[in-house]
Amino acid sequence: MRSLAWGPDKRATHYHCYNVNGFRFRTKQRDDGKKTQNSGVMVRGEYQNMSYYGLITDIIELRYTKGNSVVLFKCDWYDVAREGIGYKLDRHGITSINRTRKLYTQEPFVLECQAIQVYYVNCIKDLAWSVVIETKPRNLYDMPANKEEPYQEEEVQRFNTHVAEANEEDDERD
C-alpha cells in the first residue's frame, strides 16, 4: 500500500511487445506490415456482461518502490454501446464491430491482466464491419476433464492373457 501511496517512479518504460497470460501483445504500430495481428484486445465488462474491443497503441510499465510494477495497455476503443450501430451479434453468437465507430474516452488504459487477445477479420459484405475472433492463449490446451483408460493398455493385457492361455493348451496336448 505504501508503494502505491508514494506513487510511481517518474520514468515509465514503453514496450512494442509484451507477453502475458499466454498471449503475445503488440502495439498497432508494430503490427502494421505484419501478416499476424497481435494488437487486438478485448475486455469483458462487468455491467450486463458487455465486452469492449480495441487496438493497443502503447504498452507502458509503471514502476513503484520495492520492485513493484504495473503494466498498462493504452488502447483506441471502438464504440460498442448500441447494438446494430456499434456491434452486431449473429444467430451463432459471433460478434462483429463497426470499426468506423471510435470511442472517445479519457480513460483509454486497461491493466494487462484484464486483456484478452482478439483479431479482426474484415466483413465481405460491408468493409466498415469486422468479425471479432478470440485468440486462444499459447501453451494452454483444452484437455478432457475425465481420465479415460488407455485403449492400448487393455489390448496389451488381453494379448498377454491370451498368449498364456495358448501356452497352457499346448502343455495339455503333450
Predicted feature locations:
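Conserved, well-ordered core segments of regulatory domains
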Residues: 1-174
